[in-house]
Amino acid sequence: MKIIFKDTFVIRLASQLDYISIDSPKRARKFKSDLINRIKEIPTNPFRYRKSIYFSDENIRDLVFKGYTIVFRINDNTIEVFGFVKFQNKPTD
């Protein structure tokens, strides 16, 4: 399966990385590297991740990583990563 990063995810991740890098650019780079590596594991068994608490669709799942929730959609041949949430009621807050 191919992983597609939607603009909503990329923008939110970049914003969070900017915030982390204020304190430590090295930690920001490590956070990004570790997160991308975890996301790359999704295609091996995407349904092992919990059903999203933000959506009622069985194909939308949540990957919890260091207090953040990465929301992704499982399609036939792709995984669409579109949400990056921390302490929000909705992934679009």
Where are these regions (language model features)?
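Absolute protein N-terminus
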Residues: 1-2, 93
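Basic, Lys/Arg-enriched alpha-helical interface segments
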Residues: 2-60
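Enriched for short, Lys/Arg-rich terminal
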Residues: 65-69, 73-93
